[in-house]
A protein has these predicted regions:
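Active-site region of the double-stranded beta-helix
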Residues: 1-102, 119-122
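Histidine-centered metal-chelating micro-motifs
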Residues: 107-118
Length: 122
């Protein structure tokens, strides 16, 4: 199946909220600059884990999809990255809903529980 890669600014993704942090004014002092990630998300769990994904340029391949019982946040510090989004019904991907989206650096994403997604660092 071929899916056209589209820029985030040109699409709407059901179940995904986006924010470009580059549009926010950072707080500045003499020796640092701080930019908030102001998107808030209601999680089902109070046990929240965070991590940093670092990748290297390659030809992206999408042979899996993931989804979760809780919401998920992504912060793209560098970019671009290519992400696959797809609706899930009865535990299976609804391929007619597939979207390939180019995510620029400085983007914050909130992905609803149950929304299929996968990031390929490209």
């Amino acid at each position: 199946m071929n899916v056209k890669i589209q820029d985030l600014k040109d699409v709407t993704i059901s179940g995904v909220k986006t924010l470009c942090t580059k549009s926010l004014d950072p707080y500045k002092e003499t020796f640092f600059e701080w930019t908030a990630f102001p998107m808030t998300v209601d999680f089902k769990s109070t046990q929240i884990a965070c991590g940093l994904l670092e990748g290297w340029h390659h030809t992206p391949a999408f042979d899996e999809i993931e989804y979760h019982a809780d919401a998920e946040l992504f912060y793209f510090l560098e970019g671009p990255a290519v992400m696959l989004f797809v609706d899930i019904k009865d535990g299976k991907a609804v391929m007619d809903s597939a979207q390939m989206v180019r995510i620029p650096a400085g983007t914050e994403l909130s992905i609803d529980a149950g929304k299929g997604h996968f990031v390929a660092v490209a």
